[in-house]
Amino acid sequence: MVTATATATNVGYITQVIGPVIDAEFPSGKLPEIYNALKVEGTTESGLKVNVTFEVQQLLGDNRVRAVAMSSTDGLVRGMPVVDTGAPITVPVGQPTLGRIFNVLGEPVDQGEPVQAQEFAPIHRSAPPLVDLTIKPEPFETGIKVIDLLAPFKKGGKVGLFGGAGVGKTVLIQELIHNIAEEHSGLSVFAGVGERTREGNDLYNEMKESGVLDKVALVYGQMNEPPGARMRVGLTALTMAEYFRDVNKQDVLLFIDNIFRFVQAGSEVSALLGRMPSAVGYQPTLATEMGNLQERITSTKQGSITSVQAVYVPADDLTDPAPATTFAHLDSTVVLSRSLAAKGIYPAVDPLDSSSTILQADIVGEEHYNTARAVKQTLQRYKELQDIIAILGLDELSEEDKLVVARARRIERFLSQPFFVAEVFTGSPGKYVKLADTIKGFQRILSGELDNLPEQAFYLVGTIEEAIEKAEKLKSK
């Protein structure tokens, strides 16, 4: 891990301010490099204190550079001095970052003590060389039935949570952070990219209450911040995660909520820099920007970074360039369905659309693979029969198909589960379900052993034993 140090020797001045973008002129032969951090500090004539960091994006010629602001540019005027720090934006890394909230510049924003970090690292780095990578597929248990069975996470892999607005992406991420901290004692880094300030505040307070805060570093670049901050906050969080992987040799979880906002911020910056837009108005450098971020999220021989990324799908259109570009980098895709959310089945993970590259018999084992396939086949057959049921009714089906429908409806409900982080809303205590219990539960439903239990007994329970217990209670009523 390289520790960057800034040397302030180079001073220019602002020649133009266009919203969150400035042009600055420097002495001949002393142009700052691309990605260098520039600082503007001082007091305006009206007495407003200004302290803004910029990142160089373009060299314009005539000794001028164009840079993007990481915070509000209120109060900036032409002629103000600009200092080239001589290094990219550098952020604190290591143990002192845990339990704290940072902004894109690595400054604590939780009103706590200053961070006593010994080491700092630049946010721009190359991806690890190919020889350092490890390629050993290994499943990662999350305690969430639908994910562990049908879209298992790969240790050190990348997972995408796809869904439109309000289907439960952030709640699912919060549950994963809780389960990883409680069951695996793992470290997590959370990047809040362009999401609501309220959600960031809620997440912080929930983690404090559940006692997992000391295992997480939080980095926020919210909706109200300039596009430069939202575009770079993912790299700040990734730099902190890389330190735990490379120096502390730990397995880390990196949560990004929301990767679409990273693309959106890049699109805004691209327009401000005067680049010609590409498909659907996105930046022409979309694939490169995404690749630079995603290729650094990987497993090396020292440790692993497993990444879970919420992907907002504009207008529920999976062919939009932003989600489509993200797809190419993922090992598992967890698709959240609005129709399941409308039925009240949470987590609203679509069992047929969600998939994982490690759901193979030689990686997860024959028993897991066969159970997952049988579950998907049953649900697929139920989906095919729904049109017939809608037109002719359930009575017109063959006895075999009636059985398939009954089991599919039980499976659909058993895929739901009460969450720890949603206890306040649901009133049901959260459940962590071991993979072996998940497989056993679905095998018992598929075998027909539990055909006599009411469907409602399978809704929002953990293990199959809880479903049987719930059925007894329903019967006694």
From Swiss-Prot:
It is found in: Cellular thylakoid membrane. It is an enzyme of class 7 (translocase). It catalyses: ATP + H2O + 4 H(+)(in) = ADP + phosphate + 5 H(+)(out). Keywords: ATP synthesis, ATP-binding, CF(1), Hydrogen ion transport, Ion transport, Membrane, Nucleotide-binding, Thylakoid, Translocase, Transport. ATP binds at residues 163-170. It comes from the Bacteria. It is a peripheral membrane protein. Its EC number is 7.1.2.2. GO terms for cellular component: plasma membrane-derived thylakoid membrane; proton-transporting ATP synthase complex. GO terms for molecular function: ATP binding; ATP hydrolysis activity; proton-transporting ATP synthase activity, rotational mechanism. InterPro entries: AAA+_ATPase (IPR003593), ATP-synt_VA_C (IPR055190), ATP_synth_F1_bsu (IPR005722), ATPase_a/bsu_AS (IPR020003), ATPase_alpha/beta_chains (IPR050053), ATPase_F1/V1/A1_a/bsu_N (IPR004100), ATPase_F1/V1/A1_a/bsu_N_sf (IPR036121), ATPase_F1/V1/A1_a/bsu_nucl-bd (IPR000194). Produces ATP from ADP in the presence of a proton gradient across the membrane. The catalytic sites are hosted primarily by the beta subunits. F-type ATPases have 2 components, CF(1) - the catalytic core - and CF(0) - the membrane proton channel. CF(1) has five subunits: alpha(3), beta(3), gamma(1), delta(1), epsilon(1). CF(0) has four main subunits: a(1), b(1), b'(1) and c(9-12). Belongs to the ATPase alpha/beta chains family. PANTHER family: ATP SYNTHASE, ATP SYNTHASE SUBUNIT BETA, MITOCHONDRIAL. This is ATP synthase subunit beta. It comes from Synechococcus sp. (strain JA-2-3B'a(2-13)).
